[in-house]
Amino acid sequence: LKGDNMKKIFYLLIVLGGTLTLNVNAEEYFYKNKNGILLNENEYKFFKDFYTENYIDYITEDIYNDFLNNGFFDKKVFSTEYNGSNLLTRGAVHETNSKLIRMSKVCSSHCKISIVAKWKKSSVVRSYDLIGIYLEGGNFENISYAKLFSDGTCVENTETKKTDNALSTTIKLPTKGNSLEIIQSFDVKKSGIIYSSYQHAKKSISLANSRKFSFSKYGYGNVYLFDESVRSYYDAMQGVSINLN
């Protein structure tokens, strides 16, 4: 072959090689979040099912590596779904006309749990709501602060009350904004039963009064046993549960 033909063939191989590389990368990565984390389509769907679509943009490198290194992407996300009076086999969800609560688990050597409380329409009262968990027969590990998503913003909530087997986070609902979504997550050993509850304040209540409760599986949502002086402030929404055994 003459020199010019050799150059053309060499150039063609470079172009084809570059195109192949681009196609491989395009297939490998489906989404890039705000933190620069690259997810393939399976990982994106996994996080959407386990958390929500809003949460995906806030996944950090540490969170991603934790799921990857523990083999969670190869496991099935499981829950039981409660809708009205019907028990469904899709997620641990209790749903009303205005809001829902869902609890999901994925297990390897230990389990990861996510709890999602979501408003389906705008809340009229914006005061101190509560999202909590009660663990029967186990202990928590690696608890993350609850995140409140509203109209594209994300705020971590650090006002918590905790015991060895229970946790509650106080959520001050924003005065403005729709599409409210609250997510709490943590790790736990593969034993026991987890109860979760989201309690909405039906009328304005102070932060101090919102903390007047003890933890009990016999309380509201199997988590909150309110002091009589504040019991009427909360809506007594039914909770959800998941067996870890």
Where do the protein language model's features map onto the residues?
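Sec/Tat signal peptide C-region and signal peptidase I cleavage site
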Residues: 20-26
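Short non-domain terminal segments
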Residues: 8-9, 28-29, 70-71, 76, ...
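Compositionally biased, low-structure terminal segments
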Residues: 11, 47-51, 74, 79, ...
